[in-house]
Amino acid sequence: MMNHAVARRYARALFELAQEKGLLDQVNRELELVVSMYETDSYLRAFMNDQRISPSQKRKVLASVLEGKVSPLVLHFLYVVVQKRREPHLPSMYRAFQDLANEAMGVVEVEVRSAVPLAEETARNLEAKLTTKLGKRVKLRTQVAPELIGGLAVRVGDTLMDGSVRTRLRRMHERLISAQSNVIEG
C-alpha cells in the first residue's frame, strides 16, 4: 500500500508545474476526467494495474487514448506514474492534487448527501448560501443516500451538519427511551 506522503509528493510536483504554467484549473479538470475513467472502466483499470504489461506498452495506449484530449503536462505526468508503477494510486494522487488546487484557488469542497437527487435550483441556492457563510468559492459534490429518508447531510472538511430525517428520528427515539427510563426509575 502506498504511503499518502508519496501520493502528496506526486500531486505536489504536478501542482507546482501546473501552477507555474497557469494551467491549474485545466489540469484539475483533465486529471478528474482521467481518474473518473480509471475508476469507472474496469477494463482500463485492469490494464493499468497489470504488472505484466510493460510501462512502454501502457504509455503507447495512454498516448493513443488521451493525446489531444489532455494537456501534454497531464500526459507526461501519467507516463511518470506508469514508469514508476504507481498506477493503482492514481485516485489518491488526484485527491491530493485536488486539495492543493482547491486551496490555491480559494475553493472549499462540500459534500452534500440527500435522500433524493437535489433539484438544480436547490443546489444553486445551497451553494450560494454556503459561499456566503464560508467566505470561499464552494464546489458541491452531491450524493444520493436514500437511507437518509429526507433532508440533507452536509460535510465541510471535518464538520458534519446533519439535518436528515433519519438523524432526527434517531434523536427522537433516544429522547423517548431516555424519558421512558426516567419514568420507570421515578
Swiss-Prot record:
Keywords: ATP synthesis, Cell membrane, CF(1), Hydrogen ion transport, Ion transport, Membrane, Transport. Its main location: membrane. SUPFAM superfamilies: N-terminal domain of the delta subunit of the F1F0-ATP synthase. InterPro entries: ATP_synth_OSCP/delta_N_sf, ATPase_OSCP/dsu. The keyword Transferase does not apply. Disulfide bonds: none annotated. One of its GO terms (molecular function) is proton-transporting ATP synthase activity, rotational mechanism. It is a peripheral membrane protein. It is found in: Cell membrane. The keyword Signal does not apply. It comes from the Bacteria. GO terms for cellular component: plasma membrane; proton-transporting ATP synthase complex. Pfam families: OSCP (PF00213). Belongs to the ATPase delta chain family. F(1)F(0) ATP synthase produces ATP from ADP in the presence of a proton or sodium gradient. F-type ATPases consist of two structural domains, F(1) containing the extramembraneous catalytic core and F(0) containing the membrane proton channel, linked together by a central stalk and a peripheral stalk. During catalysis, ATP synthesis in the catalytic domain of F(1) is coupled via a rotary mechanism of the central stalk subunits to proton translocation. This protein is part of the stalk that links CF(0) to CF(1). It either transmits conformational changes from CF(0) to CF(1) or is implicated in proton conduction. F-type ATPases have 2 components, F(1) - the catalytic core - and F(0) - the membrane proton channel. F(1) has five subunits: alpha(3), beta(3), gamma(1), delta(1), epsilon(1). F(0) has three main subunits: a(1), b(2) and c(10-14). The alpha and beta chains form an alternating ring which encloses part of the gamma chain. F(1) is attached to F(0) by a central stalk formed by the gamma and epsilon chains, while a peripheral stalk is formed by the delta and b chains. NCBIfam families: ATP_synt_delta, PRK05758.2-2, PRK05758.2-4. This is ATP synthase subunit delta. It comes from Symbiobacterium thermophilum (strain DSM 24528 / JCM 14929 / IAM 14863 / T).
